[in-house]
Amino acid sequence: MNKVEMTYSELIGNTSISNKQKVVMFTSEIKALIKIGIVNSNLITTIAGFLLAISFTSSSFMSNWGTFLLTIIGTALVIAGGCIVNNWYDVDIDPKMSRTKNRPTVTGFFSLKSVLTFGLLTTAVGLLLLMFTSWYATLFAFIGWFGYVVLYTIWSKRRYTLNTVIGSLSGAMPPLIGWAAISPSFHIVPFVMFLIMFIWQTPHFLALAMKKRDEYEAAGIPMLPVVRGMAVTKRQIIVYIACLLPLPFFLLPTMGITFAVIATLLNLGWLAIAFTGLFVDEDKKWANTIFIFSLNYLIILFPLMIIVKLPIFS
């Protein structure tokens, strides 16, 4: 039986489905509800911030493994909580988009009341766990949650083309959370990590908006490609990627030449692909290339920050 055809209560009471199948189906719905992809990608930058703080403060990971677990689990729960509330709020527009129409809030697998309760409870537990690391980590997590749920989901998503930029605040917080769990003091490394994530998100999500332009238009969401067109969006993507160019050099004294060179090559490669958009007519195909590169960019850049701090590079 397809997941769309039943609610959570019906699944539990269905004797024709094995317990193993029920667990698989339930897990699938939970992953969709918490947006597991968003949670995982944000944890990459959280872990990077945490491990770099360990390195720069000459701390021991083994003596901080408990703090690490609290940081990762707490951050994951706060992010998941924000995504759950986002799903609850967007239940009226999600049916209009193919990538969101099968979310459990839309299909009715979970009741909206239970979704909201679960989202707020998950957030609260996450913040509580982070309090055992540091108040700064907790504050950064709350700012990220507030930015995503209130500033983006509720206030700007359905009103302004700048919704992407506004929402970028939340996605830039995880490296600060990871760092602050170990060290509350200001340092150039987490600040630049914040800037990288803040800037990176706009070309990433504008590329997605180009790919799904028709769906956003049908849902009434004023994404830049819908309101201003593809040409303007392409130019905006170029501008934001160009803004990434100077950032690796701010880390040259702390991260070394290897990181600066590789990060710059990534930036130049992404920028070169972006410029080709000015000369191609297949906008969605180009946007998909930009989108895929942005994912690889993140997967390469943040682990690279950790790798270059290994003794072999000292």
Curated annotation (Swiss-Prot):
Keywords recorded for this protein, A-Z: Cell membrane, Heme biosynthesis, Membrane, Transferase, Transmembrane, Transmembrane helix
Alphabetized Pfam families for the sequence: UbiA (PF01040)
Pathway: Porphyrin-containing compound metabolism; heme O biosynthesis; heme O from protoheme: step 1/1
Membrane topology according to the record: Multi-pass membrane protein
Record's catalysed reaction(s): heme b + (2E,6E)-farnesyl diphosphate + H2O = Fe(II)-heme o + diphosphate
Entry EC number(s): 2.5.1.141
Primary location group: membrane
Coiled coil: none
CDD domains: PT_UbiA_Cox10
GO CC field: plasma membrane
Transferase keyword on record: yes
Alphabetized InterPro entries for the sequence: Protohaem_IX_farnesylTrfase, UbiA_prenyltransferase, UbiA_prenylTrfase_CS, UbiA_sf
GO biological process terms, semicolon-separated: heme O biosynthetic process
MF (Gene Ontology): protoheme IX farnesyltransferase activity
Stated role: Converts heme B (protoheme IX) to heme O by substitution of the vinyl group on carbon 2 of heme B porphyrin ring with a hydroxyethyl farnesyl side group.
Additional information: Carbon 2 of the heme B porphyrin ring is defined according to the Fischer nomenclature.
Quaternary structure note: Interacts with CtaA.
Similarity comment: Belongs to the UbiA prenyltransferase family. Protoheme IX farnesyltransferase subfamily.
Protein name: Protoheme IX farnesyltransferase
Naturally occurring in which organism (per UniProt): Oceanobacillus iheyensis (strain DSM 14371 / CIP 107618 / JCM 11309 / KCTC 3954 / HTE831)
Name of encoding gene: ctaB
